[in-house]
Design a protein with these regions (language model features):
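A short, basic/flexible loop-to-alpha-helix module at the beginning of a structural domain
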Residues: 77-88
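Phosphate- and divalent-cation-binding pockets in alpha/beta enzyme and binding domains
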Residues: 63, 84, 103-106, 187-188
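Conserved beta-strand elements of the Class I
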Residues: 91-95, 177
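Short, conserved phosphate/pyrophosphate- and ester-handling motifs at nucleotide-, phospho-/glycolipid
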Residues: 21, 100, 181
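Reductase modules of NAD(P)H-dependent flavoproteins
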Residues: 46, 59-61, 66, 72, ...
């Protein structure tokens, strides 16, 4: 998609593995220091690869396409984060807004390899549409047994709590997992809590890309 970069890093020994939804700090330029990136791949110790998907949202991420070169060395610290999809609810509702879809891509791949019994709906509101990327996401969701709801700005309207409740009438038995613009996540959390959802059932990834 426009402005989106997928980067693969092959790790030396020392990485202990990660869970879907976690992130790492990556340093590609010591003068700028480390920046957080959500890991978009399930861990496979046989190939020791991490995939990061980034979008040009600020000065640092806008320069990555020109800065990163095949074969260059980077420093990776982590994994960090507790966005681990672990809970006791029978259903989960995932909301990956824009580039916030990244942790869910990793979880889809992990779930396809290790299925569980939860019923899951994944909402992906996005301002940009690239057929190849949507086809990959659709295939990953089908392989994982997850129901995908795609909403493109200007075509399907904006996602809100009312729309989610209409699409998933059983939402009260679900936990919510959100990654995307913080203000959007806070608005959804307030909406659902006002409609009776316990606060502890709404999980939000908090770090922001720069």
């Amino acid at each position: 998609a426009l402005g989106v970069l997928e980067t693969t890093v092959v790790l030396d020994d020392g990485w202990c593995g990660h869970a879907a939804g976690q992130f790492a700090f990556v340093t590609s330029d010591k003068r700028e220091g480390a920046h957080p990136y959500t890991i978009a791949s399930a861990w496979n110790p046989a190939d020791r690869r991490l995939i990061f998907i980034t979008k040009a949202l600020g000065d640092h991420t806008s320069r990555l396409r020109e800065r990163l070169k095949i074969g260059m060395r980077v420093t990776v610290e982590g994994p960090y984060g507790r966005f681990d999809f672990e809970d006791n609810q029978p259903r989960q509702i995932w909301i990956g807004a824009g580039i916030g879809i990244t942790p869910f891509v990793a979880r889809l791949k992990q779930r396809a390899a290790h299925p569980d019994t939860k019923t899951i709906d994944l909402f992906h509101p996005t301002a940009e549409f690239e057929q190849a990327a949507i086809d990959r996401l659709t295939a990953d969701a089908e392989a994982a047994g997850v129901r995908l709801h795609l909403l493109v700005d200007g075509k399907n309207g904006r996602l809100n709590g009312e729309g989610i409740r209409a699409a998933v009438p059983e939402w009260r038995s679900a936990s919510f997992w959100f990654c995307g613009p913080p203000g959007f996540g806070e608005a959804l959390r307030e909406d659902f809590c006002a409609n009776g959802l316990p606060l502890e059932q709404f999980h939000q990834e908090l770090f922001q890309m720069r």
